[in-house]
């Protein structure tokens, strides 16, 4: 069922970390979780045009720290930081504690799954063909270093009456491999025909540690210092001849000595002579000649 499960939840505590990092008792957990959901919905609506990839919420003692990962940090900050100050006040009012807002820039939005899905949905709402939008996003992702990408759109594609699902994949997307860094994102396009859902999987490489970005590569090439010097070639080693080719075999020696033909001229093989140093016996077979005809023409019996 690796194709069905959420790739982010499948890799939590293995190669991924949580998007909300705080601890609460059983009595306070539900209320704090509801606050997190409201904050994320508010930021999604408020920063719709800021290309927000994800939101990280941390809660130290009687405080809150929210990190916004965006491809357009200038839109979030606003002129002279006015927008971000208003954002802090609103978030502090919702959470009831002082809030610190940090902005992190997404360097490559073309390989971020959430931003790819949002870009495709915006194009679908502008009545652009879904196949063209999907293939263009795949080409940009592979060009900027993604090892594989898969995009799936489902709904009333092109306004058809019966909803269907269509997906494209390029490269490899190992969903069952836990160490694989799979970035997963979804988005919805609200069209006149209904809602079209878009899912994106991006394979960025293998990771060893737990975090948001790919860690050390498992198949990284060793450095020059780690490489051991190679020995001489086989045909250049002193005191050794060049080895025979793999396919050639040496002739097999007889196990019990040499076999000789019988002296009586029969077809039966003679018994092996004991020892390989025994002298070889040569047997010459003589064919009986027919009697010559008489000189006077008479037959001889």
UniProtKB/Swiss-Prot annotation:
Gene Ontology biological-process entries: translation
Domain (KH type-2) ranges: 39-107
Keyword Manganese attributed: no
A Gene Ontology cellular-component term: cytosolic small ribosomal subunit
Keywords annotated in UniProt: Ribonucleoprotein, Ribosomal protein, RNA-binding, rRNA-binding
GO molecular function: mRNA binding; rRNA binding; structural constituent of ribosome
A Pfam family: KH_2
Compositional bias of kind Basic and acidic residues: 224-244
Biased composition (Low complexity): 245-257
Highest taxon in the source lineage: Bacteria
Xref: PROSITE patterns: KH_TYPE_2, RIBOSOMAL_S3
HAMAP family named among the record's database cross-references: Ribosomal_uS3_B
This protein's name: Small ribosomal subunit protein uS3
Name of encoding gene: rpsC
